[in-house]
Amino acid sequence: MYSISNKKPSILSMVPLNILKNQDLKVKKDQEKKISFNPVVTPIRPDDYHEKTSRSSSSSHSDSPEFLRINNNKSGHKNGKLKSFESKKLVPLFIGDLHETVTEETLKGIFKKYPSFVSAKVCLDSVTKKSLGHGYLNFEDKEEAEKAMEELNYTKVNGKEIRIMPSLRNTTFRKNFGTNVFFSNLPLNNPLLTTRVFYDTFSRYGKILSCKLDSRKDIGFVYFEDEKTARNVIKMYNNTSFFGKKILCGIHFDKEVRSVPNFETQKSRLDAETIIEKEQSLNEKHSKGNDKESKNIYSSSQNSIFIKNLPTITTRDDILNFFSEVGPIKSIYLSNATKVKYLWAFVTYKNSSDSEKAIKRYNNFYFRGKKLLVTRAQDKEERAKFIESQKISTLFLENLSAVCNKEFLKYLCHQENIRPFKIQIDGYDENSSTYSGFIKFRNFEDATRIFNFLNNRLVGGSIVTTSWERQNNAPKYHDGYGMRNIHTSSHPQITPYYQYSHANSLNSPHMRDLSSMNSSTRSLIKNKNFNKKVLETFEKQVRRGIDFMRFPSATRDENVHGIAEYIFDTYWNRDVLILDKFLSLLNSSPYHEGVLQKQIEEAASSLGFKR
């Protein structure tokens, strides 16, 4: 008969204008009978402590109102007396560390044994609708809420310990100064030390709002309601044996508290005997690789390992979760994302035996599709050198032939999309007629690629050797010798191997073929007949390539021979085997024919045969 709206019903509209005064009592009774449904709404907001999640959450039952207490019980009024506007203040609890399979129905089934239990909510990701791992409980009775918290806190639900604490909306109160106690060096590998045991141990000293253990670092936190209780616990347990292991404890200051302007003033007001947490494992200031201090936080220790080839999206939490499986971690240093396609890190374990386990277990292990390199970390000085080497890496080259000059090295790098910082040939050995030099690269990865390609490879008649340090006996460059006396073409296309470095990658089959002949192969083909045959074939190719209109006198036999000798000496370093391999490719590759043609034209011009 009556509709519910936001407007209060006018009592005058319910009274007839001609009603008699003696009918007043009857109208009142009729009114009470007719107004039987009157909703009372009591909203309970979630704990804003967990509002830092990236996405908003919603109830797993989206069709029902969240945290609404609706009184639609007809028995709510007795003997005709209206009680519909009465409401009780609910007691909210926060429940965390929920397994992903825990639903609101799961929680209702667990807490329904408490008569004053009203409702449960599991917070969900607004997009994926998956559990965020926490939720809220509502009780009508405070004593029953505390009883439920005491009985069920840190018990397992679907295989995971749940954590129940008061839902504190006041941030200042929740982070009450000096009540959060930090414990380090806890023996969390002891199966007897569970979170429930840890909770029971300290709850007898005072009310605990929350406690947590982290086996990845062997640390724990107990958040007391009272500051005096926290100080007493620290005095009793600091530097004492706990489950057979000496532990340390002190006041922990939350990051938000440490950032307030008057933090130091507040800290100075603490009791002089109060111990403040000194060990800040995985301190925030060391979380970024670009901090200068972070490069010096690792002492020379047998507890540290070096990890290379991590995916570029790796975070410190990823490393902590993955590498703590073998033992608790003390600290992590993760490099910044650079131009290279991987990250590297230093991880320091609390126990040296765990670092040994990590090397054996994780070296050559695939992590998110990348094969890891895990080794013993170097000492402080060596580590500093390595970090510096990531900026500019220098590769030293020895035993270079005249062919392997600066121009050749430049094109070699260009083909592989490598931009060297500097290329220099600065040494010459008179005995072997070879050169030495170095290439500076912008990163270690580029240097490694050229190192692997050139090391022990035959190029232009000499086997190149590469190293990360200059040889002590490396000959120095002399003005009387060196590449300045070797003819350098103004056309790079005619230099040996240009066609391979320009048209093919470092792994080109042509490059592998031309460089695959080792010294034993060369010794098998050291006879005059073979050399003569190759040179005769080469001279015929030179004769065919001479343009009579441009170089008329060059076609004479003696001049053809001179041009062929010039090319053989200048461009091929008198290497018969390499020249023979090149000639075998002429008929199958027009490009090779073009290279030889340009060599012939430049040689003829240099020798003065041009018209």
UniProtKB/Swiss-Prot annotation:
One of its GO terms (biological process) is sporulation. Residues 45-54 have a biased composition (Basic and acidic residues). Residues 37-81 are annotated as: Disordered. GO terms for cellular component: cytoplasmic stress granule; cytosol; nucleus; prospore membrane; ribonucleoprotein complex. It holds the Pfam family RRM_1. One of its GO terms (molecular function) is poly(U) RNA binding. The keyword Kinase does not apply. Gene3D superfamilies: 3.30.70.330. SMART domains: RRM, RRM_1. InterPro entries: Nucleotide-bd_a/b_plait_sf, RBD_domain_sf, RRM_dom, RRM_dom_euk. It is found in: Nucleus. Keywords: Nucleus, Repeat, RNA-binding. Residues 91-169, 179-247, 303-379, 393-471 form the RRM domain. This is Protein PES4. It comes from Saccharomyces cerevisiae (strain ATCC 204508 / S288c). The gene is PES4.
